[in-house]
Every structure is written in C-alpha cells, then in structure tokens.
Amino acid sequence: MAELITVARPYAEAVYSLATEQGKLDQWSDALSWLAAMVNNPDLAQVVTNPKHTAQEVEALMLDVLGSRGNDDVKRFIAALIENARLTLLPEIAAQFELLKAQSENIVDALVESAFALSDEQKAELTNTLSKKYGKAVRLDVRENADLIGGVRVSVGDDVIDASVRGKLQAMAASLKN
C-alpha cells in the first residue's frame, strides 16, 4: 500500500498543480473519479490491461467512456499513464488528488465507525467536535460496524480515536496481560 502511494503521489501532485493553475479542480476531480472507477470495474480493467490492445485503443476507449470529461490535458495524462504502465494506479492517484484538494479547501475527512446507526443530531455533534479539534471543516463518512459492540471509532488521517466497547475491552485485556 505504501508503495502505491509513493508511486501515485507525484502523478496526483502534477495533476493537482495543473488543475489549480487552470482553476479546474472540480473537473479534474470528476475525471479522475471516472478513470478510477473504470480501472476498478473488472470488465473494463480486463480490456485496459490486456496486452493485445494497443495504447491508442486503450486511450480511445477510456476517452470514449469519459465523454465530455476528457479534454486534451486528460488525454495527455492517460497517454502518460499508459506509456509508463501506470493505469492501475488510477484509484490511488484519484485518492491522493482528493487529499490534496481537501487540504487546499481546509477540509479533513473523518471515517466514523459506529456499532449502531447515528442520528443526524449525533453526526452534527461529531462534526462540530472534530471541527474544533482539527480547526478544519469535517467531511464525515459514517459506517456501521457491529464488531465494535457499542460506541464509535473515529479515524482522521493517522489519528484514531477509539471510544468503542471493543476497544476498551482490548485495552483492558492488554493491561491484564502485563
């Protein structure tokens, strides 16, 4: 995983720089999202990674699927990825691009895992608390995880706040072993 990030980051930074220069962050975000989805689609992935297809055929197919999202810069980007055998990195490139975009917009993404569904009020309270803690706007991704037994686990970047019953039980078990 770390290797993918290391290889994908320069591509994401280059695209981010170009998108910022052109004032087209949202358009690039949309295009990268579509390109990543193509590579993640098993049927399309088989076609674009099949050595029987020429680089021009793969590029044409991807641009055809992209439709109006594909401009000359996107075309050159796809060509560069094909030339360097990096098409499979598109999902990670898109993720790194979104991180850069969120940083520039002063937004932090938070993954919230909860044993039970959270109410809108609880989500708003979490958003407020995290926003104060990080000094940024917070974009929540809330998921249910019954394995937590109760409580929540919040991940923001490398920070993990584990206020779950499972986390507390694991901490107690670890302290009893020592």
Swiss-Prot record:
Subunit organization: F-type ATPases have 2 components, F(1) - the catalytic core - and F(0) - the membrane proton channel. F(1) has five subunits: alpha(3), beta(3), gamma(1), delta(1), epsilon(1). F(0) has three main subunits: a(1), b(2) and c(10-14). The alpha and beta chains form an alternating ring which encloses part of the gamma chain. F(1) is attached to F(0) by a central stalk formed by the gamma and epsilon chains, while a peripheral stalk is formed by the delta and b chains.
Q: Give the matching HAMAP family.
A: ATP_synth_delta_bact
Places the protein is found: Cell inner membrane
Return the InterPro entries for the record: ATP_synth_OSCP/delta_N_sf, ATPase_OSCP/dsu
Q: Which family does it belong to?
A: Belongs to the ATPase delta chain family.
Q: What gene makes this protein?
A: atpH
Q: According to its UniProt entry, what is the function of this protein?
A: F(1)F(0) ATP synthase produces ATP from ADP in the presence of a proton or sodium gradient. F-type ATPases consist of two structural domains, F(1) containing the extramembraneous catalytic core and F(0) containing the membrane proton channel, linked together by a central stalk and a peripheral stalk. During catalysis, ATP synthesis in the catalytic domain of F(1) is coupled via a rotary mechanism of the central stalk subunits to proton translocation.
Q: What is this protein called?
A: ATP synthase subunit delta
Q: How does it sit in the membrane?
A: Peripheral membrane protein
Q: Name one GO cellular component term.
A: plasma membrane
Q: A Pfam family matched by this chain, by name? A: OSCP
Gene Ontology MF terms: proton-transporting ATP synthase activity, rotational mechanism
Name the keywords, alphabetized: ATP synthesis, Cell inner membrane, Cell membrane, CF(1), Hydrogen ion transport, Ion transport, Membrane, Transport
